[in-house]
Regions:
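Bacterial N-terminal signal peptides
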Residues: 6-16
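Extracellular/lumen-exposed scaffold segments
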Residues: 20-176
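N-terminal secretory signal peptides that target proteins for export/translocation
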Residues: 1-4
Length: 176
């Protein structure tokens, strides 16, 4: 009888710890990030792309100059082929107070335009694109997204993604 009661206690502890692990995992899903591929600009030899970040209520993501707190988003290409340079662009941000600290960033949804400069438009672009950022609500959480890029620039067509990326690009301050 004693062993059976110990077994029940252990079973209850295991079940409660696994439900905590699931709820912690669910809390991690405060955002969604997607890579959008747009059209190829053959005059300037770049692929227009974007990282779209959709945030849950009350979550924010920082701008390139976050203010007194926070870290700006950044892009890193890993094992990339046929790319000479990548420019991550930032649409005009909003001003927020985070624990009485002035910060700059975005809420709800943002597309960060990318200009991916191509060495040879007749060759495939492929590799890994890594997006790093920090999102905040009551706390700040670093995020990392890995995207695979396989794209043939010369075959690009205008798509819904192109229109959305161009809208975001039009919101980038002209100092870029």
């Amino acid at each position: 009888l004693l062993n059976l009661s110990k077994l029940w206690v252990i079973l209850i502890l295991i079940l409660s710890s696994s439900s905590q692990a699931n709820s912690l995992n669910e809390n991690k899903l405060n955002y969604r990030a997607d890579l959008l591929l747009g059209n190829f600009n053959d005059k300037q030899n770049y692929l227009l792309a974007g990282v779209k970040v959709k945030l849950d209520n009350n979550w924010k993501i920082y701008w390139k100059n976050p203010g007194e707190a926070g870290l700006p988003p950044k892009i890193i290409f890993d094992k990339i082929s046929n790319v000479s340079n990548v420019n991550l662009l930032f649409p005009e941000p909003k001003s927020f107070k985070f624990f009485n600290i002035d910060t700059f960033g975005y809420d709800k949804e943002i597309i960060f335009p990318l200009k991916i400069y191509v060495k040879n438009p007749e060759k495939m672009i492929f590799g890994n694109l890594k997006f790093y950022a920090q999102i905040c609500n009551q706390i700040c959480v670093p995020i990392e997204e890995n995207f695979k890029l396989n794209y043939f620039p010369i075959n690009s067509q205008i798509s819904n993604s192109s229109l959305k990326i161009n809208e975001a690009l039009n919101k980038v301050p002209k100092l870029y």
